[in-house]
Protein backbone atom coordinates (compact mmCIF):
# COMPACT_ATOMS: atom_id res chain seq x y z
CA UNK A 1 0.00 0.00 0.00
CA UNK A 2 2.89 2.33 0.63
CA UNK A 3 3.36 2.40 -3.09
CA UNK A 4 0.24 4.45 -3.65
CA UNK A 5 1.85 7.83 -4.13
CA UNK A 6 5.44 6.85 -4.79
CA UNK A 7 6.31 7.27 -8.42
CA UNK A 8 9.27 4.91 -8.30
CA UNK A 9 6.99 1.90 -8.31
CA UNK A 10 5.52 0.99 -11.63
CA UNK A 11 5.15 -2.29 -13.39
CA UNK A 12 6.57 -0.83 -16.58
CA UNK A 13 10.01 -0.41 -15.02
CA UNK A 14 10.49 -4.13 -14.82
CA UNK A 15 9.86 -5.16 -18.39
CA UNK A 16 11.49 -2.21 -20.06
CA UNK A 17 15.14 -3.22 -19.89
CA UNK A 18 14.96 -6.64 -21.50
CA UNK A 19 14.60 -5.37 -25.07
CA UNK A 20 17.67 -4.76 -27.16
CA UNK A 21 15.64 -2.64 -29.55
CA UNK A 22 12.86 -0.52 -28.13
CA UNK A 23 11.47 0.30 -31.57
CA UNK A 24 11.29 -3.40 -32.55
CA UNK A 25 9.61 -4.23 -29.24
CA UNK A 26 6.88 -1.61 -29.74
CA UNK A 27 6.36 -2.53 -33.38
CA UNK A 28 5.82 -6.17 -32.41
CA UNK A 29 3.54 -5.31 -29.48
CA UNK A 30 1.36 -2.83 -31.37
CA UNK A 31 1.33 -4.28 -34.87
CA UNK A 32 2.08 -2.34 -38.05
CA UNK A 33 -1.26 -0.55 -38.40
CA UNK A 34 -1.33 0.93 -34.89
CA UNK A 35 2.40 1.61 -34.96
CA UNK A 36 2.06 3.70 -38.14
CA UNK A 37 -1.02 5.50 -36.85
CA UNK A 38 0.64 6.43 -33.57
CA UNK A 39 3.85 7.63 -35.21
CA UNK A 40 1.79 9.81 -37.57
CA UNK A 41 -0.10 11.26 -34.60
CA UNK A 42 3.15 11.90 -32.71
CA UNK A 43 4.77 13.72 -35.62
CA UNK A 44 1.60 15.71 -36.40
CA UNK A 45 1.32 16.82 -32.75
CA UNK A 46 4.93 18.03 -32.71
CA UNK A 47 5.16 19.59 -36.19
CA UNK A 48 1.70 21.08 -36.53
CA UNK A 49 2.41 23.17 -39.65
CA UNK A 50 4.06 20.53 -41.85
CA UNK A 51 2.14 19.35 -44.92
CA UNK A 52 0.51 15.93 -44.83
CA UNK A 53 2.82 14.40 -47.46
CA UNK A 54 5.91 15.33 -45.46
CA UNK A 55 4.58 13.50 -42.40
CA UNK A 56 3.58 10.42 -44.38
CA UNK A 57 7.11 10.27 -45.78
CA UNK A 58 8.63 10.46 -42.27
CA UNK A 59 6.25 7.79 -40.97
CA UNK A 60 7.10 5.44 -43.82
CA UNK A 61 10.82 5.88 -43.17
CA UNK A 62 10.40 5.15 -39.46
CA UNK A 63 8.24 2.12 -40.23
CA UNK A 64 10.76 0.67 -42.68
CA UNK A 65 13.49 1.22 -40.11
CA UNK A 66 11.41 -0.51 -37.41
CA UNK A 67 10.97 -3.52 -39.69
CA UNK A 68 14.73 -3.87 -40.16
CA UNK A 69 15.07 -3.87 -36.37
CA UNK A 70 12.36 -6.51 -36.00
CA UNK A 71 14.33 -8.68 -38.43
CA UNK A 72 17.60 -8.06 -36.59
CA UNK A 73 17.56 -6.30 -33.22
CA UNK A 74 21.30 -5.72 -33.35
CA UNK A 75 21.18 -3.87 -36.67
CA UNK A 76 22.65 -0.36 -36.72
CA UNK A 77 20.82 2.29 -34.59
CA UNK A 78 18.17 -0.22 -33.48
CA UNK A 79 19.34 0.12 -29.88
CA UNK A 80 18.63 3.87 -29.81
CA UNK A 81 15.80 5.21 -27.65
CA UNK A 82 12.54 6.20 -29.30
CA UNK A 83 13.11 9.85 -28.37
CA UNK A 84 16.47 9.76 -30.09
CA UNK A 85 15.05 8.08 -33.21
CA UNK A 86 11.98 10.32 -33.46
CA UNK A 87 13.85 13.50 -32.56
CA UNK A 88 16.52 12.77 -35.16
CA UNK A 89 13.74 12.22 -37.69
CA UNK A 90 11.95 15.49 -36.83
CA UNK A 91 15.23 17.36 -37.09
CA UNK A 92 15.71 16.22 -40.70
CA UNK A 93 12.77 18.41 -41.78
CA UNK A 94 14.42 20.95 -44.06
CA UNK A 95 12.01 23.82 -43.41
CA UNK A 96 12.17 23.56 -39.62
CA UNK A 97 13.74 27.00 -39.03
CA UNK A 98 11.53 28.96 -41.43
CA UNK A 99 8.30 27.21 -40.43
CA UNK A 100 8.79 26.98 -36.68
CA UNK A 101 11.39 29.61 -35.81
CA UNK A 102 13.05 29.00 -32.46
CA UNK A 103 11.72 25.44 -32.26
CA UNK A 104 14.61 24.58 -34.59
CA UNK A 105 16.96 25.37 -31.69
CA UNK A 106 15.67 22.21 -30.01
CA UNK A 107 17.69 20.20 -32.52
CA UNK A 108 20.95 21.47 -31.06
CA UNK A 109 20.08 19.89 -27.71
CA UNK A 110 20.71 16.33 -26.51
CA UNK A 111 18.03 13.97 -25.20
CA UNK A 112 16.15 14.25 -22.91
CA UNK A 113 16.35 18.07 -23.18
CA UNK A 114 15.56 17.94 -26.88
CA UNK A 115 12.22 16.18 -26.37
CA UNK A 116 11.31 18.56 -23.50
CA UNK A 117 12.05 21.42 -25.86
CA UNK A 118 9.75 19.99 -28.56
CA UNK A 119 7.01 19.52 -25.96
CA UNK A 120 7.27 23.15 -24.86
CA UNK A 121 6.71 24.28 -28.42
CA UNK A 122 3.44 22.42 -28.90
CA UNK A 123 0.85 25.04 -29.77
CA UNK A 124 -2.62 24.73 -28.21
CA UNK A 125 -4.05 27.33 -30.56
CA UNK A 126 -2.25 26.70 -33.84
CA UNK A 127 -2.89 29.14 -36.62
CA UNK A 128 -4.61 26.61 -38.89
CA UNK A 129 -7.67 27.15 -41.08
CA UNK A 130 -10.92 25.68 -39.75
CA UNK A 131 -11.67 22.28 -41.24
CA UNK A 132 -14.25 22.57 -43.99
CA UNK A 133 -16.38 19.50 -44.64
CA UNK A 134 -16.60 18.70 -48.38
CA UNK A 135 -19.76 17.47 -50.07
CA UNK A 136 -20.74 13.93 -49.09
CA UNK A 137 -20.19 12.55 -52.61
CA UNK A 138 -16.73 14.08 -52.73
CA UNK A 139 -15.83 12.47 -49.39
CA UNK A 140 -17.22 9.08 -50.39
CA UNK A 141 -15.25 9.13 -53.62
CA UNK A 142 -12.06 9.98 -51.74
CA UNK A 143 -12.81 7.23 -49.23
CA UNK A 144 -13.30 4.61 -51.96
CA UNK A 145 -10.36 5.75 -54.06
CA UNK A 146 -7.84 5.46 -51.25
CA UNK A 147 -9.16 4.44 -47.87
CA UNK A 148 -5.74 4.34 -46.18
CA UNK A 149 -4.81 7.89 -47.21
CA UNK A 150 -8.28 9.15 -46.31
CA UNK A 151 -7.95 7.83 -42.74
CA UNK A 152 -4.36 9.01 -42.34
CA UNK A 153 -5.52 12.50 -43.31
CA UNK A 154 -8.12 12.35 -40.55
CA UNK A 155 -5.47 11.40 -37.96
CA UNK A 156 -3.17 14.15 -39.23
CA UNK A 157 -5.79 16.91 -39.29
CA UNK A 158 -7.11 16.14 -35.81
CA UNK A 159 -3.68 15.59 -34.23
CA UNK A 160 -2.15 18.83 -35.52
CA UNK A 161 -5.12 20.84 -34.21
CA UNK A 162 -5.15 18.99 -30.87
CA UNK A 163 -1.51 18.42 -29.91
CA UNK A 164 -2.45 16.70 -26.64
CA UNK A 165 -5.21 14.45 -27.98
CA UNK A 166 -5.03 11.05 -26.26
CA UNK A 167 -3.36 9.08 -29.05
CA UNK A 168 -4.74 5.55 -28.50
CA UNK A 169 -8.20 7.10 -28.23
CA UNK A 170 -7.65 8.97 -31.50
CA UNK A 171 -7.09 5.59 -33.18
CA UNK A 172 -10.50 4.57 -31.81
CA UNK A 173 -12.08 7.71 -33.31
CA UNK A 174 -10.43 6.94 -36.65
CA UNK A 175 -11.88 3.41 -36.57
CA UNK A 176 -15.37 4.85 -36.01
CA UNK A 177 -14.77 7.42 -38.76
CA UNK A 178 -13.88 4.58 -41.12
CA UNK A 179 -16.95 2.56 -40.11
CA UNK A 180 -19.22 5.56 -40.72
CA UNK A 181 -17.97 5.96 -44.29
CA UNK A 182 -17.99 2.23 -45.00
CA UNK A 183 -21.65 2.08 -43.97
CA UNK A 184 -23.00 5.39 -45.25
CA UNK A 185 -21.32 5.59 -48.64
CA UNK A 186 -23.38 2.48 -49.53
CA UNK A 187 -26.63 3.97 -48.20
CA UNK A 188 -29.55 5.23 -50.30
CA UNK A 189 -29.38 8.66 -48.66
CA UNK A 190 -25.68 9.07 -47.96
CA UNK A 191 -25.94 12.48 -46.31
CA UNK A 192 -28.74 11.53 -43.92
CA UNK A 193 -26.68 8.54 -42.81
CA UNK A 194 -23.25 10.17 -42.64
CA UNK A 195 -23.66 13.75 -41.43
CA UNK A 196 -25.17 12.99 -38.00
CA UNK A 197 -22.39 10.45 -37.41
CA UNK A 198 -19.70 12.97 -38.36
CA UNK A 199 -21.28 15.65 -36.15
CA UNK A 200 -21.31 13.22 -33.25
CA UNK A 201 -17.66 12.26 -33.79
CA UNK A 202 -16.67 15.92 -34.04
CA UNK A 203 -18.43 16.89 -30.80
CA UNK A 204 -17.18 13.82 -28.93
CA UNK A 205 -13.68 14.42 -30.27
CA UNK A 206 -13.60 18.01 -29.05
CA UNK A 207 -14.80 16.87 -25.63
CA UNK A 208 -12.22 14.08 -25.50
CA UNK A 209 -9.44 16.49 -26.47
CA UNK A 210 -10.42 18.95 -23.73
CA UNK A 211 -10.62 16.24 -21.06
CA UNK A 212 -7.18 14.95 -21.98
CA UNK A 213 -5.78 18.49 -21.95
CA UNK A 214 -6.80 18.79 -18.30
CA UNK A 215 -5.07 15.50 -17.46
CA UNK A 216 -1.87 16.70 -19.13
CA UNK A 217 -2.10 20.09 -17.41
CA UNK A 218 -2.53 18.37 -14.03
CA UNK A 219 0.59 16.29 -14.62
CA UNK A 220 2.68 19.07 -16.13
CA UNK A 221 1.71 21.96 -13.87
CA UNK A 222 0.89 20.25 -10.58
CA UNK A 223 2.86 16.99 -10.74
CA UNK A 224 1.91 13.35 -10.56
CA UNK A 225 0.72 13.58 -6.95
CA UNK A 226 -2.11 15.84 -8.14
CA UNK A 227 -3.00 13.47 -10.96
CA UNK A 228 -2.90 10.44 -8.65
CA UNK A 229 -5.21 12.15 -6.18
CA UNK A 230 -7.64 12.89 -9.02
CA UNK A 231 -7.45 9.27 -10.18
CA UNK A 232 -7.98 7.83 -6.68
CA UNK A 233 -11.16 9.88 -6.30
CA UNK A 234 -12.51 9.08 -9.76
CA UNK A 235 -11.72 5.36 -9.70
CA UNK A 236 -13.08 4.97 -6.17
CA UNK A 237 -16.38 6.44 -7.38
CA UNK A 238 -16.39 4.09 -10.37
CA UNK A 239 -15.27 0.98 -8.47
CA UNK A 240 -16.69 1.30 -4.93
CA UNK A 241 -16.49 -2.48 -4.40
CA UNK A 242 -12.77 -2.67 -5.17
CA UNK A 243 -10.26 -2.80 -2.32
CA UNK A 244 -8.00 0.18 -1.73
CA UNK A 245 -4.96 -1.86 -2.84
CA UNK A 246 -6.67 -2.63 -6.16
CA UNK A 247 -7.60 1.00 -6.75
CA UNK A 248 -4.01 1.99 -5.90
CA UNK A 249 -2.60 -0.39 -8.49
CA UNK A 250 -4.96 0.94 -11.17
CA UNK A 251 -4.04 4.52 -10.24
CA UNK A 252 -0.32 3.78 -10.52
CA UNK A 253 -0.77 2.20 -13.94
CA UNK A 254 -3.14 4.89 -15.21
CA UNK A 255 -0.71 7.59 -14.11
CA UNK A 256 2.04 5.91 -16.10
CA UNK A 257 -0.14 5.71 -19.22
CA UNK A 258 -1.12 9.38 -19.09
CA UNK A 259 2.36 10.57 -18.16
CA UNK A 260 3.64 8.82 -21.29
CA UNK A 261 0.95 10.17 -23.62
CA UNK A 262 1.24 13.73 -22.27
CA UNK A 263 4.99 13.46 -22.70
CA UNK A 264 4.74 12.47 -26.35
CA UNK A 265 5.70 8.82 -25.70
CA UNK A 266 2.76 7.56 -27.71
CA UNK A 267 3.98 4.03 -28.49
CA UNK A 268 4.71 3.24 -24.84
CA UNK A 269 1.44 4.88 -23.82
CA UNK A 270 -0.69 2.83 -26.22
CA UNK A 271 1.14 -0.38 -25.31
CA UNK A 272 0.72 0.23 -21.57
CA UNK A 273 -2.93 1.19 -22.02
CA UNK A 274 -3.56 -2.13 -23.78
CA UNK A 275 -1.83 -3.94 -20.89
CA UNK A 276 -4.00 -2.07 -18.39
CA UNK A 277 -7.19 -3.01 -20.26
CA UNK A 278 -6.03 -6.64 -20.30
CA UNK A 279 -5.30 -6.54 -16.57
CA UNK A 280 -8.70 -5.02 -15.77
CA UNK A 281 -10.52 -7.63 -17.82
CA UNK A 282 -8.59 -10.48 -16.20
CA UNK A 283 -9.38 -9.12 -12.73
CA UNK A 284 -12.98 -7.97 -13.14
CA UNK A 285 -14.12 -9.77 -10.01
CA UNK A 286 -11.96 -7.62 -7.77
CA UNK A 287 -12.69 -4.37 -9.65
CA UNK A 288 -16.29 -3.95 -10.83
CA UNK A 289 -19.33 -5.86 -12.02
CA UNK A 290 -19.76 -3.33 -14.85
CA UNK A 291 -16.71 -4.35 -16.90
CA UNK A 292 -18.21 -7.47 -18.52
CA UNK A 293 -19.71 -5.84 -21.60
CA UNK A 294 -16.48 -3.93 -22.26
CA UNK A 295 -14.21 -6.93 -22.08
CA UNK A 296 -15.71 -8.81 -25.03
CA UNK A 297 -14.96 -5.95 -27.41
CA UNK A 298 -11.87 -5.54 -29.65
CA UNK A 299 -8.91 -3.61 -28.18
CA UNK A 300 -9.60 0.04 -29.07
CA UNK A 301 -13.28 -0.27 -28.27
CA UNK A 302 -12.52 -2.17 -25.07
CA UNK A 303 -10.16 0.51 -23.74
CA UNK A 304 -12.65 3.24 -24.60
CA UNK A 305 -15.48 1.33 -22.96
CA UNK A 306 -13.46 0.76 -19.77
CA UNK A 307 -12.56 4.45 -19.58
CA UNK A 308 -16.22 5.46 -19.88
CA UNK A 309 -17.72 2.67 -17.77
CA UNK A 310 -20.55 3.65 -15.40
CA UNK A 311 -20.16 3.58 -11.63
CA UNK A 312 -20.64 0.20 -9.98
CA UNK A 313 -23.22 -0.11 -7.20
CA UNK A 314 -22.01 0.90 -3.76
CA UNK A 315 -21.61 -1.94 -1.23
CA UNK A 316 -24.65 -1.97 1.04
CA UNK A 317 -23.04 -2.02 4.46
CA UNK A 318 -20.31 0.62 4.39
CA UNK A 319 -19.61 1.80 7.95
CA UNK A 320 -19.51 5.47 8.90
CA UNK A 321 -16.20 7.18 8.18
CA UNK A 322 -16.14 8.99 11.48
CA UNK A 323 -14.87 5.94 13.39
CA UNK A 324 -11.53 5.72 11.60
CA UNK A 325 -10.98 9.34 10.63
CA UNK A 326 -12.45 11.38 13.50
CA UNK A 327 -13.27 9.32 16.59
CA UNK A 328 -10.19 7.08 16.63
CA UNK A 329 -7.45 8.12 19.02
CA UNK A 330 -4.86 6.89 16.50
CA UNK A 331 -5.65 9.38 13.74
CA UNK A 332 -2.46 11.40 14.21
CA UNK A 333 -0.32 8.30 14.67
CA UNK A 334 -1.68 6.75 11.47
CA UNK A 335 -1.32 10.03 9.62
CA UNK A 336 2.28 10.56 10.77
CA UNK A 337 3.33 7.02 9.81
CA UNK A 338 2.41 7.40 6.14
CA UNK A 339 0.74 10.68 5.34
CA UNK A 340 -0.03 10.14 1.66
CA UNK A 341 -1.29 6.60 2.17
CA UNK A 342 -3.55 7.71 5.02
CA UNK A 343 -4.91 10.62 2.95
CA UNK A 344 -5.24 8.31 -0.06
CA UNK A 345 -7.32 5.90 1.99
CA UNK A 346 -9.44 8.75 3.31
CA UNK A 347 -10.05 9.95 -0.26
CA UNK A 348 -10.87 6.39 -1.40
CA UNK A 349 -13.34 5.84 1.44
CA UNK A 350 -15.00 9.21 0.96
CA UNK A 351 -15.23 8.95 -2.83
CA UNK A 352 -16.69 5.44 -2.94
CA UNK A 353 -19.49 6.67 -0.66
CA UNK A 354 -20.14 9.78 -2.76
CA UNK A 355 -20.71 9.22 -6.47
CA UNK A 356 -22.94 12.31 -6.13
CA UNK A 357 -19.95 14.63 -5.49
CA UNK A 358 -17.67 16.05 -8.16
CA UNK A 359 -14.08 14.80 -8.12
CA UNK A 360 -12.92 18.37 -7.50
CA UNK A 361 -15.13 18.63 -4.40
CA UNK A 362 -13.78 15.32 -3.05
CA UNK A 363 -10.25 16.62 -3.52
CA UNK A 364 -11.13 19.86 -1.70
CA UNK A 365 -12.47 17.80 1.21
CA UNK A 366 -9.29 15.72 1.32
CA UNK A 367 -7.27 18.94 1.26
CA UNK A 368 -9.31 20.41 4.11
CA UNK A 369 -8.89 17.17 6.08
CA UNK A 370 -5.13 17.27 5.49
CA UNK A 371 -4.91 20.91 6.62
CA UNK A 372 -6.88 20.10 9.78
CA UNK A 373 -4.58 17.19 10.66
CA UNK A 374 -1.45 19.25 10.00
CA UNK A 375 -2.78 21.85 12.44
CA UNK A 376 -4.35 19.55 15.03
CA UNK A 377 -1.70 16.86 15.27
CA UNK A 378 0.67 19.56 16.53
CA UNK A 379 -1.87 20.81 19.11
CA UNK A 380 -1.97 20.01 22.83
CA UNK A 381 -5.16 17.97 22.50
CA UNK A 382 -5.28 16.74 18.89
CA UNK A 383 -8.52 14.79 19.27
CA UNK A 384 -10.38 17.76 20.71
CA UNK A 385 -8.97 19.87 17.86
CA UNK A 386 -10.08 17.65 14.94
CA UNK A 387 -13.31 16.32 16.51
CA UNK A 388 -15.43 18.69 14.42
CA UNK A 389 -13.54 18.29 11.13
CA UNK A 390 -16.52 16.81 9.24
CA UNK A 391 -18.67 19.82 10.16
CA UNK A 392 -16.14 22.04 8.41
CA UNK A 393 -16.87 20.18 5.18
CA UNK A 394 -20.45 21.48 5.03
CA UNK A 395 -19.77 24.88 3.41
CA UNK A 396 -17.42 23.22 0.89
CA UNK A 397 -20.21 20.84 -0.14
CA UNK A 398 -22.92 23.50 -0.25
CA UNK A 399 -20.97 25.90 -2.48
CA UNK A 400 -21.00 23.74 -5.65
CA UNK A 401 -24.50 22.46 -4.81
CA UNK A 402 -25.87 26.01 -4.77
CA UNK A 403 -23.88 27.00 -7.83
CA UNK A 404 -25.32 24.11 -9.85
CA UNK A 405 -28.83 24.81 -8.60
CA UNK A 406 -28.72 28.53 -9.45
CA UNK A 407 -27.14 28.09 -12.86
CA UNK A 408 -29.45 25.26 -13.87
CA UNK A 409 -32.44 27.42 -12.91
CA UNK A 410 -31.01 30.22 -15.05
CA UNK A 411 -30.46 27.79 -17.93
CA UNK A 412 -34.04 26.43 -17.72
CA UNK A 413 -35.31 30.00 -17.75
CA UNK A 414 -33.16 31.36 -20.61
CA UNK A 415 -32.31 28.46 -22.92
CA UNK A 416 -28.77 27.74 -24.13
CA UNK A 417 -28.04 30.79 -26.30
CA UNK A 418 -29.18 33.37 -23.75
CA UNK A 419 -27.56 31.41 -20.93
CA UNK A 420 -24.27 31.61 -22.85
CA UNK A 421 -24.82 35.36 -23.20
CA UNK A 422 -25.33 35.70 -19.45
CA UNK A 423 -22.04 33.85 -18.89
CA UNK A 424 -20.30 36.00 -21.52
CA UNK A 425 -21.31 39.13 -19.65
CA UNK A 426 -20.38 37.59 -16.30
CA UNK A 427 -16.91 36.46 -17.43
CA UNK A 428 -16.11 39.58 -19.46
CA UNK A 429 -16.78 41.66 -16.34
CA UNK A 430 -14.50 39.39 -14.27
CA UNK A 431 -11.57 39.30 -16.72
CA UNK A 432 -12.05 41.97 -19.43
CA UNK A 433 -8.36 41.83 -20.45
CA UNK A 434 -8.78 38.36 -21.99
CA UNK A 435 -9.07 38.36 -25.79
CA UNK A 436 -12.57 38.46 -27.23
CA UNK A 437 -12.27 35.19 -29.22
CA UNK A 438 -11.14 33.36 -26.07
CA UNK A 439 -13.98 34.83 -23.98
CA UNK A 440 -16.49 33.82 -26.66
CA UNK A 441 -15.11 30.28 -27.02
CA UNK A 442 -14.88 29.64 -23.28
CA UNK A 443 -18.28 31.16 -22.42
CA UNK A 444 -20.02 29.26 -25.21
CA UNK A 445 -18.54 26.05 -23.84
CA UNK A 446 -19.35 26.94 -20.23
CA UNK A 447 -22.92 27.50 -21.43
CA UNK A 448 -23.10 23.97 -22.83
CA UNK A 449 -23.03 22.67 -19.25
CA UNK A 450 -26.77 23.37 -19.10
CA UNK A 451 -27.83 20.98 -21.84
CA UNK A 452 -25.21 18.47 -20.74
CA UNK A 453 -25.94 18.32 -17.00
CA UNK A 454 -29.07 20.16 -15.87
CA UNK A 455 -31.53 17.53 -17.09
CA UNK A 456 -29.75 14.77 -15.13
CA UNK A 457 -31.12 13.50 -11.81
CA UNK A 458 -29.96 15.42 -8.74
CA UNK A 459 -27.34 12.81 -7.78
CA UNK A 460 -25.53 13.20 -11.10
CA UNK A 461 -25.73 16.94 -11.60
CA UNK A 462 -22.80 18.11 -9.53
CA UNK A 463 -20.24 15.58 -10.79
CA UNK A 464 -21.35 16.31 -14.35
CA UNK A 465 -21.34 20.09 -14.02
CA UNK A 466 -18.34 20.85 -11.89
CA UNK A 467 -16.01 18.36 -13.52
CA UNK A 468 -17.08 19.64 -16.96
CA UNK A 469 -16.45 23.25 -15.88
CA UNK A 470 -12.95 22.26 -14.73
CA UNK A 471 -12.24 20.99 -18.24
CA UNK A 472 -13.52 24.19 -19.89
CA UNK A 473 -11.68 26.50 -17.49
CA UNK A 474 -8.49 24.55 -18.15
CA UNK A 475 -8.86 25.59 -21.79
CA UNK A 476 -9.02 29.23 -20.64
CA UNK A 477 -5.87 28.66 -18.54
CA UNK A 478 -3.99 27.00 -21.40
CA UNK A 479 -4.85 29.78 -23.88
CA UNK A 480 -4.10 32.48 -21.32
CA UNK A 481 -0.73 30.98 -20.47
CA UNK A 482 0.33 31.42 -24.10
CA UNK A 483 -0.40 35.18 -23.98
CA UNK A 484 -0.90 36.25 -20.35
CA UNK A 485 -2.89 39.47 -19.94
CA UNK A 486 -4.65 39.19 -16.58
CA UNK A 487 -3.06 38.63 -13.18
CA UNK A 488 -6.39 37.39 -11.88
CA UNK A 489 -6.53 34.64 -14.48
CA UNK A 490 -2.93 33.65 -13.81
CA UNK A 491 -3.65 33.51 -10.08
CA UNK A 492 -6.77 31.34 -10.46
CA UNK A 493 -5.02 29.06 -12.94
CA UNK A 494 -1.79 28.47 -11.05
CA UNK A 495 -2.56 28.61 -7.33
CA UNK A 496 -4.57 25.42 -6.95
CA UNK A 497 -5.92 22.94 -9.44
CA UNK A 498 -8.90 21.92 -7.31
CA UNK A 499 -9.85 25.50 -6.48
CA UNK A 500 -9.73 26.87 -10.01
CA UNK A 501 -13.49 26.84 -10.50
CA UNK A 502 -14.33 28.41 -7.10
CA UNK A 503 -11.58 30.97 -7.76
CA UNK A 504 -13.16 32.02 -11.07
CA UNK A 505 -16.66 31.91 -9.55
CA UNK A 506 -15.54 34.28 -6.79
CA UNK A 507 -14.06 36.92 -9.11
CA UNK A 508 -15.96 40.20 -9.14
CA UNK A 509 -16.14 43.09 -11.61
CA UNK A 510 -12.57 44.21 -12.33
CA UNK A 511 -12.53 47.76 -10.92
CA UNK A 512 -8.98 48.45 -12.11
CA UNK A 513 -9.88 47.84 -15.75
CA UNK A 514 -9.81 50.89 -18.02
CA UNK A 515 -12.79 50.51 -20.41
CA UNK A 516 -11.92 49.93 -24.04
CA UNK A 517 -12.43 52.96 -26.29
CA UNK A 518 -15.51 52.70 -28.49
CA UNK A 519 -14.62 51.56 -31.99
CA UNK A 520 -17.42 51.86 -34.55
CA UNK A 521 -15.53 49.42 -36.80
CA UNK A 522 -16.16 46.62 -34.27
CA UNK A 523 -19.90 47.20 -34.62
CA UNK A 524 -20.04 47.54 -38.40
CA UNK A 525 -21.78 44.64 -40.14
CA UNK A 526 -22.36 43.66 -43.76
CA UNK A 527 -24.72 41.59 -45.87
CA UNK A 528 -22.52 38.51 -45.39
CA UNK A 529 -24.16 38.22 -41.94
CA UNK A 530 -27.28 36.96 -43.69
CA UNK A 531 -25.69 33.88 -45.25
CA UNK A 532 -24.03 32.66 -42.05
CA UNK A 533 -25.19 29.50 -40.31
CA UNK A 534 -27.14 29.91 -37.07
CA UNK A 535 -24.02 29.07 -35.04
CA UNK A 536 -21.86 31.59 -36.92
CA UNK A 537 -24.53 34.28 -36.44
CA UNK A 538 -24.53 33.58 -32.71
CA UNK A 539 -20.74 33.89 -32.54
CA UNK A 540 -20.91 37.25 -34.37
CA UNK A 541 -23.55 38.55 -31.96
CA UNK A 542 -21.68 37.20 -28.95
CA UNK A 543 -18.45 38.81 -30.16
CA UNK A 544 -20.29 42.15 -30.31
CA UNK A 545 -21.69 41.56 -26.81
CA UNK A 546 -18.21 41.00 -25.35
CA UNK A 547 -16.96 44.17 -27.04
CA UNK A 548 -19.91 46.11 -25.60
CA UNK A 549 -19.10 44.93 -22.09
CA UNK A 550 -15.41 45.78 -22.57
CA UNK A 551 -16.52 49.27 -23.59
CA UNK A 552 -19.05 49.62 -20.73
CA UNK A 553 -18.17 47.10 -17.98
CA UNK A 554 -20.78 48.61 -15.66
CA UNK A 555 -23.68 48.33 -18.09
CA UNK A 556 -26.76 46.76 -16.49
CA UNK A 557 -28.44 43.58 -17.69
CA UNK A 558 -31.38 45.65 -18.95
CA UNK A 559 -29.16 48.00 -20.96
CA UNK A 560 -27.28 45.12 -22.57
CA UNK A 561 -30.49 43.22 -23.30
CA UNK A 562 -31.94 46.33 -24.98
CA UNK A 563 -28.91 46.72 -27.21
CA UNK A 564 -28.81 43.01 -28.11
CA UNK A 565 -32.53 43.00 -28.95
CA UNK A 566 -32.03 46.03 -31.19
CA UNK A 567 -29.07 44.29 -32.80
CA UNK A 568 -31.11 41.17 -33.57
CA UNK A 569 -33.93 43.32 -35.00
CA UNK A 570 -31.51 45.36 -37.13
CA UNK A 571 -29.86 42.24 -38.59
CA UNK A 572 -33.22 40.59 -39.24
CA UNK A 573 -34.57 43.73 -40.94
CA UNK A 574 -31.56 44.11 -43.25
CA UNK A 575 -31.42 40.42 -44.11
CA UNK A 576 -35.04 40.68 -45.33
CA UNK A 577 -34.34 43.85 -47.35
CA UNK A 578 -34.06 43.75 -51.14
CA UNK A 579 -30.74 45.59 -51.11
CA UNK A 580 -29.13 44.07 -48.03
CA UNK A 581 -25.77 45.84 -48.21
CA UNK A 582 -27.45 49.26 -48.60
CA UNK A 583 -29.61 48.52 -45.56
CA UNK A 584 -26.56 47.59 -43.45
CA UNK A 585 -24.77 50.75 -44.61
CA UNK A 586 -27.74 52.94 -43.66
CA UNK A 587 -29.09 51.22 -40.53
CA UNK A 588 -25.68 50.27 -39.11
CA UNK A 589 -24.60 53.75 -38.00
CA UNK A 590 -28.10 54.34 -36.53
CA UNK A 591 -27.76 51.14 -34.51
CA UNK A 592 -24.30 52.20 -33.29
CA UNK A 593 -25.56 55.66 -32.28
CA UNK A 594 -28.62 54.23 -30.51
CA UNK A 595 -26.43 51.70 -28.68
CA UNK A 596 -24.02 54.37 -27.48
CA UNK A 597 -26.95 56.45 -26.25
CA UNK A 598 -28.51 53.46 -24.49
CA UNK A 599 -25.26 52.68 -22.66
CA UNK A 600 -24.28 56.26 -21.89
From Swiss-Prot:
Pfam families: Serum_albumin
Protein known as: Albumin
Phosphoserine modification, residue list: 21, 74, 81, 289, 435, 505
Positions bearing Phosphothreonine: 99, 436, 438
Residue positions where N6-succinyllysine is found in the record: 221, 452, 535, 580
Signal sequence range: 1-10
Chief place where the protein resides: secreted
Disulfide bonds: 69-78, 91-107, 106-117, 140-185, 184-193, 216-262, 261-269, 281-295, 294-305, 332-377, 376-385, 408-454, 453-464, 477-493, 492-503, 530-575, 574-583
N6-methyllysine: residues bearing it: 550
Binding site for Zn(2+): 83, 263, 265
Binding site for Ca(2+) 2: 29, 271, 275
Domain of life: Eukaryota
Keywords: Calcium, Cleavage on pair of basic residues, Copper, Disulfide bond, Lipid-binding, Metal-binding, Methylation, Phosphoprotein, Repeat, Secreted, Signal, Zinc
Example GO BP: cellular response to starvation
Propeptide, chain numbering: 11-16
Organism: Macaca mulatta (Rhesus macaque)
Expression by tissue: Plasma.
Biological role stated in the UniProt entry: Binds water, Ca(2+), Na(+), K(+), fatty acids, hormones, bilirubin and drugs. Its main function is the regulation of the colloidal osmotic pressure of blood. Major zinc transporter in plasma, typically binds about 80% of all plasma zinc. Major calcium and magnesium transporter in plasma, binds approximately 45% of circulating calcium and magnesium in plasma. Potentially has more than two calcium-binding sites and might additionally bind calcium in a non-specific manner.
Gene Ontology CC annotation, any one: extracellular space
Positions that bind Ca(2+) 1: 22, 260, 265, 268
